Amino acid sequence: MKKDIHPDYHMIDVKLTDGTVIQMKSTWGKEGDTLSLEIDPSSHPAWTGGSSRLMDTGGRVSKFKKKYEGLGF
């Protein structure tokens, strides 16, 4: 493997939607930075069986529903 071509791998804090903070290794940001998630396994419909309400970030869900309202979505 070539040296000095790979990004720095360091510890960051990841803040989940329920406020829980976990530490993990990542190439994102700098050592000690906090990454706040907008959606995670505790809030994503794929993992919650669809029981969680989808978050409308930037009105995209509303725009989609308005565009296709005649199709019964």
Curated annotation (Swiss-Prot):
This is Large ribosomal subunit protein bL31. GO terms for cellular component: ribonucleoprotein complex; ribosome. PROSITE patterns: RIBOSOMAL_L31. It holds the Pfam family Ribosomal_L31. Belongs to the bacterial ribosomal protein bL31 family. Type A subfamily. It comes from the Bacteria. Binds the 23S rRNA. NCBIfam families: L31, PRK00528.1. One of its GO terms (biological process) is translation. GO terms for molecular function: rRNA binding; structural constituent of ribosome. Keywords: Ribonucleoprotein, Ribosomal protein, RNA-binding, rRNA-binding. InterPro entries: Ribosomal_bL28/bL31-like_sf, Ribosomal_bL31, Ribosomal_bL31_sf. Part of the 50S ribosomal subunit. The keyword Hydrolase does not apply. The lineage of its organism: Bacteria, Pseudomonadati, Pseudomonadota, Alphaproteobacteria, Rhodobacterales.
